């Protein structure tokens, strides 16, 4: 009951409003506010009132302008960067090493036999076209060639370039002769790959400025088609094993061997080996700078067994990266040359970004709308993994198969000429698509916490001419138990990886403008220009609420009056009285209220006394204008 009473009082208070007019509210505010200026508007003479009114408006506008600048600066989410450099005990980076040749030619040769023969025929056709006709009928497997052939483009006539096929008749109705091709080769025709759709209705040409580039890219594309049809375990067995590649290992003062490395299969480089990856064991620390406290390796790359057309670079591909991160060694790695000792001084850059809304980065990639196809390796998120997963996803959706160089989701197949004849055309279009790259870049985010390794590299010949004899003897005996030298300078690589004197550099972001900075500047501007405080803002908010309150009450009253006017307009005359309404219910004959005048009646028949009712009218609550509880509450309020 008491709650209902208080609610009714509150409702009546809302209906009555503040009890002031607009003018009274303004006068009250100017007289009672703690802000300088408004008081002078109502206390001074007419001229000073006008002056203080203009000054108050001017300074209020300045305050609002300054507030807008500070709020816009705060919402720009700017950051400040702090840099710290020093030396401390840190985890040694994970080191990934790969051979430049992904496979041993002696083990993969049977898979590449047809492709190698075709490659040799192409070289003969390019280098000695007048001699290649004698071998034109040689037994070649043209099924590979027909999917993606190499062509010569004669652009001596830029308005009508000619496309010359290396094998068979020329296209576009062109005549074919060895002489014309010889002249074309002598003058340097461009070589290109012709990529066509399944029904050959759409064909594109991928041009190259050098025949070396064209032949290398064409061979890799065809080899990709072959490797995609071979189980990965067989490819692992055809690559370089760790016990043959890693001849010697030393970390600090502790010896190590190939068993301390984790093996993964990387499509570009075959078997790769990772030291100190931290997947199953704790990361190894390093507390001192210099080569004596780093990692030392002697590697045998077996250059004599390289695939001739697949690996044109000899050496070791290596990369330093963080523990539990996937090594994208093709994009971020470096080469170490055979026959040299390569020393690498390491400086660790730790980047710590603020995250949303200051920078579009992610902590673990959970909010990135791209399925991570590298999740099977149980590695941390990286933007490289996201970009490649995004490309593979587009490849599967557009070409119905995945590229051999990237991991596959479950249930999908790698692209090959047998199952997907037009995959090369689709892959080329997707690879050159700017829209696809922009889409993936827009969806993938950088990691908020990133570690980069800056390397200072120096090289020297190793071993020297004076010591190579005994060094190769010892290494050959350890590897093959042979008294003869089975190693050579062109197959040996020595690596030294260590921390520099200053081994870390931390680059950390922090908010340039926080909420404390914003409130301080807002209050400072308000206090400087108008002498106000937070309480002054509360007073101003109160007067705004009262203004809105009065306006709402006036609008409600106006709506009621308009409704009443519409109701009155629906009647022809004045509204009926209560007596007329009662008479309408009892006078079923609709007789007139006054009897007809007789000659004996007086001049004023309406003055005739009406009959007195025998019983008083019923005491209906509906005849009251207000409920009893409202009347009682009003009376109690007046008494209070």
Curated annotation (Swiss-Prot):
Per the UniProt topology annotation, the Cytoplasmic ranges are 1-50, 554-640
Keywords attached to this Swiss-Prot or TrEMBL record, sorted alphabetically, are: Cell membrane, Cytoplasmic vesicle, Disease variant, Disulfide bond, Glycoprotein, Ion channel, Ion transport, Membrane, Phosphoprotein, Sodium, Sodium channel, Sodium transport, Transmembrane, Transmembrane helix, Transport, Ubl conjugation
The record's listing under InterPro entries reads:
ENaC, ENaC_chordates, ENaC_CS
- Show the segment(s) annotated as Disordered: 590-640
**What exactly does this protein do?**
This is one of the three pore-forming subunits of the heterotrimeric epithelial sodium channel (ENaC), a critical regulator of sodium balance and fluid homeostasis. ENaC operates in epithelial tissues, where it mediates the electrodiffusion of sodium ions from extracellular fluid through the apical membrane of cells, with water following osmotically. It plays a key role in maintaining sodium homeostasis through electrogenic sodium reabsorption in the kidneys. Additionally, ENaC is essential for airway surface liquid homeostasis, which is crucial for proper mucus clearance.
Outline the subunit composition.
Answer: Component of the heterotrimeric epithelial sodium channel (ENaC) composed of an alpha/SCNN1A, a beta/SCNN1B and a gamma/SCNN1G subunit. An additional delta/SCNN1D subunit can replace the alpha/SCNN1A subunit to form an alternative channel with specific properties. Interacts with WWP1 (via WW domains). Interacts with WWP2 (via WW domains); inhibits the channel. Interacts with the full-length immature form of PCSK9 (pro-PCSK9); inhibits ENaC by promoting its proteasomal degradation.
Task: List the PANTHER family hit by this protein, alphabetically.
Answer: AMILORIDE-SENSITIVE SODIUM CHANNEL SUBUNIT BETA (PTHR11690:SF18), AMILORIDE-SENSITIVE SODIUM CHANNEL-RELATED (PTHR11690)
Identify this protein by name.
Epithelial sodium channel subunit beta
Give the organism, scientific name: Homo sapiens
């Amino acid at each position: 009951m008491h709650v209902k009473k208080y609610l009714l009082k509150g409702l009546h208070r809302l209906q009555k409003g503040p009890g002031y007019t607009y003018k009274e509210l303004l006068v009250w505010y100017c007289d009672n506010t703690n802000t300088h200026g408004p008081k002078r508007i109502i206390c001074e003479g007419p001229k000073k009132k006008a002056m203080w009114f203009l000054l108050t408006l001017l300074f209020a506008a300045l305050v609002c302008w300054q507030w807008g600048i500070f709020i816009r600066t705060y919402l720009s989410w700017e950051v400040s960067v702090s840099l710290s450099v020093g030396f401390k005990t840190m985890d040694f980076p994970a080191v990934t090493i790969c051979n430049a040749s992904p496979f041993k030619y002696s083990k993969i040769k049977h898979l590449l036999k047809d492709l190698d023969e075709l490659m040799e025929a192409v070289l003969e056709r390019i280098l000695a076209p007048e001699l290649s006709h004698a071998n034109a009928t040689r037994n070649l497997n043209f099924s590979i060639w027909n999917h993606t052939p190499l062509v010569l483009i004669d652009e001596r006539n830029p308005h009508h370039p000619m496309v010359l096929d290396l094998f068979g008749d020329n296209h576009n109705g062109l005549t074919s002769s060895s002489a014309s091709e010889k002249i074309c080769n002598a003058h340097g025709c461009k070589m290109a790959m012709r990529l066509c759709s399944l029904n050959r209705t759409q064909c594109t040409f991928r041009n190259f400025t050098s025949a070396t580039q064209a032949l290398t890219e064409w061979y890799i594309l065809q080899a990709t088609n072959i490797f995609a049809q071979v189980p990965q375990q067989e490819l692992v067995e055809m690559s370089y094993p760790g016990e043959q590649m890693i001849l010697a290992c030393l970390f600090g003062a502790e010896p190590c061997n190939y068993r301390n490395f984790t093996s993964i299969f990387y499509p570009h480089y075959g078997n790769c080996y990772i030291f100190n990856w931290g997947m199953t064991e704790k990361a190894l620390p390093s507390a001192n700078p210099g080569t004596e406290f780093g990692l030392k390796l002697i590697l045998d790359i077996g250059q004599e067994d390289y695939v001739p057309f697949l690996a044109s670079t000899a050496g070791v591909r290596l990369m330093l990266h963080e523990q539990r991160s996937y090594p994208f060694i093709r994009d971020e790695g470096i080469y170490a040359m055979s026959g040299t000792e390569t020393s690498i001084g390491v400086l660790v850059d730790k980047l710590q970004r603020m995250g949303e809304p200051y920078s579009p980065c992610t902590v673990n990639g959970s909010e990135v709308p791209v399925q991570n196809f590298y999740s099977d390796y149980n590695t941390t998120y990286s933007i490289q993994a996201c970009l490649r997963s995004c490309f593979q996803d587009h490849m599967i959706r557009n070409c119905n198969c995945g590229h051999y160089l990237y991991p596959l989701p479950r249930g999908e197949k790698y692209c090959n000429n047998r199952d997907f004849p037009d995959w090369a055309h689709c892959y080329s279009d997707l690879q050159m698509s700017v829209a696809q790259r922009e889409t993936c870049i827009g969806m993938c985010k950088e990691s908020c916490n990133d570690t980069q390794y800056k390397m200072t590299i120096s090289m020297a010949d190793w071993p020297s001419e004076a010591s190579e004899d005994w060094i190769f003897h010892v290494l050959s005996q350890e590897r093959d138990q042979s008294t003869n030298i089975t190693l050579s300078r062109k197959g040996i690589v020595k690596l030294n990886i260590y921390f520099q004197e200053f081994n870390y550099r931390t680059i950390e972001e922090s908010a340039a403008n926080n909420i404390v900075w914003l409130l301080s500047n807002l209050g400072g501007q308000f206090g400087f220009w108008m002498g106000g405080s937070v309480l002054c803002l509360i007073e101003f908010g109160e007067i705004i609420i009262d203004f809105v309150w009065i306006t709402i009450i006036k609008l409600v009253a106006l709506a009621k009056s308009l409704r009443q006017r519409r109701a009155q307009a629906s009647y022809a005359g004045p509204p009926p009285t209560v007596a007329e309404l009662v008479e309408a219910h009892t006078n079923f004959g609709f007789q007139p209220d006054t009897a007809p005048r007789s000659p004996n009646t007086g001049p004023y028949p309406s003055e005739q006394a009406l009959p007195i009712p025998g019983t008083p009218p019923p005491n209906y609550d509906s005849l009251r204008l207000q409920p009893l509880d409202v009347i009682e509450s009003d009376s109690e309020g007046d008494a209070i």
